[in-house]
Amino acid sequence: MNTNKATATYLKSIMLPETGPASIPDDITERHILKQETSSYNLEVSESGSGVLVCFPGAPGSRIGAHYRWNANQTGLEFDQWLETSQDLKKAFNYGRLISRKYDIQSSTLPAGLYALNGTLNAATFEGSLSEVESLTYNSLMSLTTNPQDKVNNQLVTKGVTVLNLPTGFDKPYVRLEDETPQGLQSMNGAKMRCTAAIAPRRYEIDLPSQRLPPVPATGTLTTLYEGNADIVNSTTVTGDINFSLAEQPADETKFDFQLDFMGLDNDVPVVTVVSSVLATNDNYRGVSAKMTQSIPTENITKPITRVKLSYKINQQTAIGNVATLGTMGPASVSFSSGNGNVPGVLRPITLVAYEKMTPLSILTVAGVSNYELIPNPELLKNMVTRYGKYDPEGLNYAKMILSHREELDIRTVWRTEEYKERTRVFNEITDFSSDLPTSKAWGWRDIVRGIRKVAAPVLSTLFPMAAPLIGMADQFIGDLTKTNAAGGRYHSMAAGGRYKDVLESWASGGPDGKFSRALKNRLESANYEEVELPPPSKGVIVPVVHTVKSAPGEAFGSLAIIIPGEYPELLDANQQVLSHFANDTGSVWGIGEDIPFEGDNMCYTALPLKEIKRNGNIVVEKIFAGPIMGPSAQLGLSLLVNDIEDGVPRMVFTGEIADDEETIIPICGVDIKAIAAHEQGLPLIGNQPGVDEEVRNTSLAAHLIQTGTLPVQRAKGSNKRIKYLGELMASNASGMDEELQRLLNATMARAKEVQDAEIYKLLKLMAWTRKNDLTDHMYEWSKEDPDALKFGKLISTPPKHPEKPKGPDQHHAQEARATRISLDAVRAGADFATPEWVALNNYRGPSPGQFKYYLITGREPEPGDEYEDYIKQPIVKPTDMNKIRRLANSVYGLPHQEPAPEEFYDAVAAVFAQNGGRGPDQDQMQDLRELARQMKRRPRNADAPRRTRAPAEPAPPGRSRFTPSGDNAEV
């Protein structure tokens, strides 16, 4: 799929055929042209007001359907006409195949004198052929299917229905369009020759029993031998041999006429009749043979054929009693074929649209559009440019996966026309990889489509929509890590520095001198993908596989393989179905691309690509598009499996290389890439790694790892599991199992370092950071609201740089450090007993004066927590420094703006000092003193206590007017 356009063009052409054709991206790369053909019919409604449209949505030729009317009594159908494309394709083209098709069926033309249209439409898609439909009445049409997505009922004719062709298969061959071949000048006038539609024909064969022919009632009257269903819409060829013998010699020559009638839906009038006549005489009555050989061109198939009838008659009355017995000279049979009948879409499935109670003589409009891939005939090819189809497995598989989820996404074959028009916006979103699927989110389908895109479509095209121009450069750096799987589950490369390459071009790394390594460079073409869940094997071993892509230097990625006992070549891709042998022919292994240099245990093993190990022990294996496994890790796994593993599968991935002595394991490269593959399954990578295990005995490795290998499987969580290995992968220098792979990765690292100072490096890191932190949706919504980045620019112009606050030790370590510090101080002061443990028991306090005096006097260690007050001098009752006590008392009581503290309060403060040995009050004692002060201030006064009054205010001096000047009262 072209990620520059970021559009699934093939899927878009299927769901929106009016947008035009797009080449089918499969591996049929014929030169062709793309052509869109229209079909437009105005069908006149009969007097009954009812009829049926038979649509062939997948037919690759020009005939796309047929129209039938019900008779006036609605007791029988009458064929009206074929529905075909505007151009007869076989006139100009030799081969073709259908890409997509759509019909719109609606009525909007009023007959003269009417003001409104009546009538309704029923439509249903039937998975079988037309002859298998039991009833074509309006009401019984809905019983053809139980799938609600394949039927529409009681839709007004003015609203209309839409029929959409959804492919039933994607293996579509080019079919011959029954074109006429050039003829010579001496040909008879009117004679012509055509290439018949003989690709995948549907063949019918009527086998008659070896018994008596049923008697005829009279001469010239047909007697039926067989009558049954058959579907034919294209040319057919009839061949047959009906042989019989008469019981008696005929009196006269008797003519036997065997007649094969091809009939349609509407009546018993044959569309085409094939007759074979033979004379029974005295010479041949013991073995008479009637041969049938006739070709019927498409022009003679004037309506869809749904029934055949084989009958016979005779011309002699005397021969009626002469018994004829079939099969005298061999089987009696008649066969005929339906051209292209087994091509998907030619005869099945079909869509039936019935209309009822429409106004007679009103018009029913059928407007269709069909998209084709066509190969012109030689005459037209001289003046027309053709192009090869592009093989795009991603585009094809994305279409497959979307259409395989048609029920969840509500993609239908028949629609109410207004619903289909409403859904076109969703279809455009699904096929546009740069869309964030806002409409699909409203319908509840965004998660499904996103999940499919992650598997089958380029992830970078949906990673950062506004960075679409950078996609081509992004896949050089981190694209390989974020876009990991191709359509259908096939791996893509995931090493840094390389473009995306399908495993079609990859090769499992190994020794170049392997027995099969060179012969298998030209691998088989295969596109099959399967997953198979197997029960827990009796034993097994998991090894990593490193793949490289020679067309892209530096390309490398990893996967896992599990080697189990048994022969399972059918579970391997055709490229991996290689059988290798142990030394001295002591066993074999499927899926290994080189012979094993040591002896086996006379058993056969199979190396299968591993996808998942479930908790119950079941293993899920898959077919991947890659070559067979080669390399030292596979040989190490086989050595452990043959010599050491007796039961079960160790939950770990083994890597390493067995030395020549077959006992020593030497270092091996590729640890980083193998670790990514192992960690995705929640498995550890175990074995000989550079700098970890320089040299380990084979037996000791098995004893140490296998016996303890009971680790539970824990799958990596999150959708960004590959991103977190980016730093490790870029920093590593070891990514291969041989010198060639090491050289390739060194080139990758050098190329990655070249862009570290470029602006693109910052953009790519930003994209990775955005996806890693799940900010893609938020950034995309912000970009729509702030297209000029004015708000965002102001927001991030000064990024926050908060220095990280140093984290101190936790409480336990802090207390231990405190105890150690107090212990050192106490020991320096002479208290040798004060160890950190003793300080901790003493409530993390140093020795008190009593404890220190006790130690000095007795020489024994004091008990932690005991103050030994008897060994210290009792404090004085009232300290001599009363000034200090008064200052504190006045401060607590409330001076200097309130009354001085009473003597009782001084005494209370002095008592606190005495209690503390001369020290001031602690926090609790200070709170008690403040409470005592408040109580003393609220204490009521005695009546004898004089109340202090204020002195009266002095009167103000007499004022004067500011207009009266000072001096005498003289006249101004």
Curated annotation (Swiss-Prot):
It holds the Pfam family Birna_VP4. GO terms for cellular component: host cell cytoplasm; viral capsid. Changing residue 54 to I: In strain: Isolate NVI-010. A divalent metal cation binds at residue 26. The record marks 442-443, 486-487, 495-496, 508-509, 715-716, 734-735 as: Cleavage. Keywords: Capsid protein, Host cytoplasm, Hydrolase, Metal-binding, Protease, Serine protease, Virion. Residues 963-972 have a biased composition (Polar residues). The keyword Protease applies. The active site is at residues 633, 674. Changing residue 221 to A: In strain: Isolate NVI-001, Isolate NVI-013, Isolate NVI-015, Isolate Sp116 and Isolate NVI-023. Changing residue 595 to L: No effect on polyprotein processing. Changing residue 247 to T: In strain: Isolate Sp122, Isolate NVI-001, Isolate NVI-013, Isolate NVI-015 and Isolate NVI-023. Changing residue 968 to N: In strain: Isolate Sp116. SUPFAM superfamilies: Positive stranded ssRNA viruses (SSF88633). Changing residue 678 to S: No effect on polyprotein processing. Residues 801-817 have a biased composition (Basic and acidic residues). This is Structural polyprotein. It comes from Infectious pancreatic necrosis virus (strain Sp) (IPNV).
